[in-house]
Amino acid sequence: MKRQALAAMIASLFALAACGGEQAAQAPAETPAASAEAASSAAQATAETPAGELPVIDAVTTHAPEVPPAIDRDYPAKVRVKMETVEKTMKMDDGVEYRYWTFDGDVPGRMIRVREGDTVEVEFSNNPSSTVPHNVDFHAATGQGGGAAATFTAPGRTSTFSFKALQPGLYIYHCAVAPVGMHIANGMYGLILVEPKEGLPKVDKEFYIVQGDFYTKGKKGAQGLQPFDMDKAVAEQPEYVVFNGHVGSIAGDNALKAKAGETVRMYVGNGGPNLVSSFHVIGEIFDKVYVEGGKLINENVQSTIVPAGGSAIVEFKVDIPGSYTLVDHSIFRAFNKGALGQLKVEGAENPEIMTQKLSDTAYAGSGAASAPAASAPAASAPAASASEKSVY
C-alpha cells in the first residue's frame, strides 16, 4: 500500500514538471516594446545613481577659441573640473597692457563641456599671488548663488563643491566677489556647455567666443599699462569692446579657419559686465540660432542678441571662400573699440552664389545737370579706419 502511494506521488510530480516545462515552452518571447521599456528603466536607474557611485571623469577643458570634444557617453558621470584664478598683466592692444583677473590665465576662462545629468565637482584654487579673494557663480547650477558662497576662496587656498547639471544649455560662469562688476570687467568669465542627453548634431568646426567690455583710465590706444576705471564702468562707457579678452584675439594671424562647404558652430558668450551684444558675421546668415543658449531654435537669422551674462549658439554653412568678419553690430564697437574677429574660409569660388565686381563705369547722376550750386562747402567725411578698410 505504501509502495503504491509512493509510486502515485512520483507520477504526479513528473506530471507537474512536464506541465511546467510545457508552460515555459509556450511563454511568449519578450517584445521590442518590453525591451525598450527595460532599457528605459535601466537608464532611469543609472540616472538616479547617487553621485558617490558614478564613474569619475576628469573634464577636458579648452582655452578659447578651441572647444572640448563632444560627449560620447550615454550615461551620467561625476566630472571633475579644476579651476585656478590668476591675476596677470597681458596685452590688451598694440602697446597697451592691462592687469587682467582671470580663470586659468586667460580671458575668457576655459570652456567646460559636460552632459545633462552629470555631477560636476569643482576644485577651485586661488593663486597665492592674487591680491583679493575670488569665487565662481555657475549659471548652469541650480541653487543659491550658483556656487559663489561655496567657492569663496582666499589667495593661496583651494575650495571644492559640486552641483548637478540638471538642464541642458550654454551657460556663463563668472566671479561674484564684491565689487562683482569689477571682477567681471577685469575678465573673470567663461562658458560651460551642458549637452542634452541625446547630444548635439555633428558639425565640421566648433569655436568658442566670448565678448567683454573693458574700462581703462586712458582712451582706446593710450599706451602703457592701463588701470581699471570704476567711474567709466559705472557709467557704462567702455574704451574697449573685444572678443576673447584682447583686440585681434581672433583676427589676422589668429583668425578662425574653415573650408567652403563646412558647417560651423560658434558658442558665443557675453561676459559683459554691461553691454548687450548684437552678434553678426558679415557675409553670412545663421542657419540656426539656439536662442540665448537654450532649447529654442530660430532659423535664417542675420544678427542675434547675446545679453550680458548670457549666450547663444549659432550655426551656418560657409558656401564660398572669403574672409568673414565677426562683429558686434552696434557697429562703432566693432570699428572703433575692437569687437572684430575673422573667419577665413578656403575653397573654390562659386559665381552662382556671388560674383566678384563685374563692371565699374562712370555715373553722372540723374539730376546732375540741373542741380543747384552748393551754398556752402560740404563737410568732408572722416577717413575710414584701418579695420573698416580690411573688412569692406
Swiss-Prot record:
The protein's assembly and partners: Homotrimer.
Keyword terms of this UniProt record: Cell outer membrane, Copper, Lipoprotein, Membrane, Metal-binding, Oxidoreductase, Palmitate, Repeat, Signal
SUPFAM superfamilies: Cupredoxins
One Gene Ontology cellular component annotation held by this UniProt entry: cell outer membrane
Cofactor needs: Cu(+); Cu(2+)
Misc. comment: Undetected during aerobic growth.
Residues annotated as binding Cu cation 1: H134, C175, H183, M188
Keyword flag Metal-binding: yes
Organism: Neisseria gonorrhoeae
Record's note on what induces expression: By anaerobic and microaerophilic conditions in the presence of nitrite. Regulated by the gonococcal fnr and NarP homologs.
UniProt subcellular location: Cell outer membrane
Lipid modification (N-palmitoyl cysteine), residues: C19
Top-tier EC class: oxidoreductase
Protein name in the entry: Copper-containing nitrite reductase
Membrane topology: Lipid-anchor
Ranges annotated as spanning the membrane: none
E.C. number(s) listed in UniProt: 1.7.2.1
Lipidation (S-diacylglycerol cysteine): C19
Post-translational changes noted in the entry: Palmitoylated.
Segments for region (Disordered): 30-49, 367-392
